[in-house]
Amino acid sequence: MALQPAAGARDLNPQQVELNQKLSQRLAEVYRLWGYDEVSPPRVERLETLKAGGAIASQDIVRLVADEPLGLRPEMTASIARAACTRLRQRPRPLRLWAAGTIFESRTADEGSLCIEENLQSGVELFGVEPINAEMELLSLLFSAVETLELSKQHQPRLLVGHTALMDLIMLPFQNDLREKIRTALIHYDRLALENLQLPNDQFERLLHHLECRGEPLDVLERLSGLFGTQQALNNLQRLFEQMGPLAADQGIDLQLDPTFQPHFELYTGLVFQLVCQSDAAPVVIARGGRYDNLVARCGAKGLQAAGVGFSFAIDDIRELLTKEIKASEAVESTLVAYGDQATLEHALKRQRHWHKQGQRAVVELEACHDREEAFSRLADRGCSTLDWLDH
């Protein structure tokens, strides 16, 4: 029998499970305050759904052996979008939904073998609202949710924002295969790849300018307006950042606009963003999201019905980031009910019920102790802070 979990699988201890639940509950309370209803999408879906119309690569999906092509969900947006366009299609828009659950990604390990990456997510989806109104609510909700996580300055939270329309503007002068090569180089911040394309000097310098055109959103928008003139996407972003700037400043979140930023999954057809924090070892993405109208349209929606935005939090990564803070602020008091030779286990169990009726966590020591001192010495091992000693 194998004594280690599969590579990439999560094998959480009780404390980690408890912290995950606390984080999920905090976020769920915020979602409910904003009028979002909980749904529970299936872990197993048809591959056609999981691929999201080609937006998610086959190699990112964990496939199952079955009579029909099935896989484990690498994210929950596609499944929720399908439900919104089928079972929930008669519900009025805006349609506000939230979900929490495990996702599974297939990845290649360092030695070249395939393994499963298992993660807990919590997030929201908003259907039936056009730009930029949906994005205004979505990011406002994001900031409200982040506030409950109580990030500190040492985490250096930064919201990185992009927009597919900005990348389209940059790509306008280029065609076909060259267009895709340039796009890939910009997304990966690969100057060498751009040099190897041997573009005319003016085009190369312009692309380098776009590559370096990132930073404070309003400054970047001013520079982009000078290059591309009046554009609806730029106007929408201007309005969005004017609204989000004060909210971000209140929470110490740095806003950064990057015209070449595009996420790993090609779901998005508008605003895209990710929230990055600094851990002890390296930067970590704790939330990501954006607009995915094309995905909703592929599920059969038409017109304004084919509009969707959403985001998700990476609960496991947030837990690792905040473990020390949560442990220090939310330690739970627990009582150890122990008994000596003059009492019995039955007495201890009855006493335990007394504590439980008061809503107090209580654990029974199942073997009799010689004396109070022995019982007291077992407190730490049992995870308890106080002793209830029975000896008569």
UniProtKB/Swiss-Prot annotation:
Gene3D superfamilies membership: Bira Bifunctional Protein, Domain 2
GO BP terms in the entry: histidyl-tRNA aminoacylation; L-histidine biosynthetic process
UniProt keyword terms in alphabetical order: Amino-acid biosynthesis, Cytoplasm, Histidine biosynthesis
Subunit structure: Heteromultimer composed of HisG and HisZ subunits.
Note: This function is generally fulfilled by the C-terminal part of HisG, which is missing in some bacteria such as this one.
Record family assignment: Belongs to the class-II aminoacyl-tRNA synthetase family. HisZ subfamily.
NCBIfam families for this protein: PRK12292.2-1
UniProt cross-references to PANTHER family, sorted A to Z: HISTIDINE--TRNA LIGASE, MITOCHONDRIAL-RELATED (PTHR43707:SF1), HISTIDYL-TRNA SYNTHETASE (PTHR43707)
HAMAP family in the cross-refs: HisZ
Name assigned to this protein: ATP phosphoribosyltransferase regulatory subunit
Gene: hisZ
